[in-house]
Amino acid sequence: MRHYETMFILKPTLVEEEIKSKIEFYKEVITKHHGVIETSLDMGMRNLAYEIKKHKRGYYYVAYFKAEPSMILELERLYRINEDVLRFIVIKYESKKEVEAWHALVDRANKKPSHAKEKHEKTEHTHSHHLEEAESVGSHSE
């Protein structure tokens, strides 16, 4: 399975029940095709960067999931034929570095410290420890 992120923007004219229904529909598309949703972010109503189909606002939803590449075409097809979807994007994370970034995004969405941040903090701690040692050696030699 590959790592993906999808975001879609729904029309602002939908009522809460319709929004929930659309979100559940797309989540089911992923899971029915043996995908696994790791986490999702319900970002709510936001201003659009530019007007889309005469709308200045839209309802944003993001999901991070693992799935087989074959189901992505079906997901995109279903986005395209739904007139309530203003915009959508599906991003595939391929390289080791991209997959690490995907995990960091999932951790952030789940409010956990990310793997990448832990690595960075470890490196930063080691680096500052070496600087302290170098400074103490430098001050002793004077």
Swiss-Prot record:
**Sequence segments annotated as region (Disordered):** 110-142
Q: Which domain of life is it from?
A: Bacteria
Q: Where is the composition biased (Basic and acidic residues)?
A: 110-133
Keywords for the protein's UniProt record, in alphabetical order: Ribonucleoprotein, Ribosomal protein, RNA-binding, rRNA-binding
Protein name as annotated = Small ribosomal subunit protein bS6
Q: Offer an example of a GO molecular function term for this protein.
A: structural constituent of ribosome
What PROSITE patterns is this protein classified in?
RIBOSOMAL_S6 (PS01048)
Q: Which family does it belong to?
A: Belongs to the bacterial ribosomal protein bS6 family.
